[in-house]
UniProtKB/Swiss-Prot annotation:
Its main location: secreted. Keywords: Amidation, Neuropeptide, Secreted. This is Periviscerokinin-1. InterPro entries: Periviscerokinin. Belongs to the periviscerokinin family. The lineage of its organism: Eukaryota, Metazoa, Ecdysozoa, Arthropoda, Hexapoda. It comes from Ergaula capucina (Beetle roach). The keyword Nuclease does not apply. One of its GO terms (biological process) is neuropeptide signaling pathway. It comes from the Eukaryota. Mediates visceral muscle contractile activity (myotropic activity). GO terms for cellular component: extracellular region.
Amino acid sequence: GSSGLISFPRT
């Protein structure tokens, strides 16, 4: 759940 350029899923 990153709030950067790309949103990655939280693991």
